[in-house]
Structures are given as structure tokens and as C-alpha cells.
Amino acid sequence: MADWDELEAALADYTAQCNGNERLRRMQRDWSRRLHFTCTDNGVTFTMEVERGEIVAVERGHVGVPDIVVSTDSETFCDMFWGDLNPVQKYLRGEITVRGSQEDVLRLDAISYVIWPES
């Protein structure tokens, strides 16, 4: 089970990877959303703010009203944010749940394929 410090480190790496990917930023330039994440094993929650395709904030706890809610265990979140696994496979197996509009779920799929193209 991962604690907040480990999650925060993984999120920092993921933020740098996403914000540094020009292709991804161009592709998502019209996408601004608030995402809530919930760790099902330890109750840790966090919020990610995306503005015009750039991750501009990540903070502990749920802040504001989400456009998308993602839930899984803390280790899966860490592995996902560090790029050690493709979240699409876990999503298809029901190990990651995503609540949001169909368009937003498809956007998350597209982000996954840009970040993890070999999957």
C-alpha cells in the first residue's frame, strides 16, 4: 500500500512527463478538467487540475466539483503515474473505475496511448 508521499512523488513524475510532451499538450489544448482520485485501499484522495491540456495543480484531498472521478488502489495509481503499467488494461478488467462523460473517458484513453504507445 502506497502512502501520500509515494503518491506525490509518482504524481510529480507524471506531471513532468505529461507537461513535457508537446504532442500531448497540442492534442489536449482545448481540454480543461478537474479530476478527483480515490485510493480504494487506504482512503487517500487527491485532486488534479488540467487547464488547456497542462496539469497545473495536484493537491491532497478532494477540492471542488469534479468532472472525472478515478478510483483504484494506491499501488496501481503509483505504477500508473510512474509508467510501470498501462492503465487501459486495468480499466478494461474493472480494476480502475472512471466516472465522467464519455468524451472525457475517451480523452483519458487518448492520453494513455500517447504516454504509453507500446500498449
Question: What is each PLM-predicted segment?
Answer:
Residues 1-119:
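Feature captures hydrophobic
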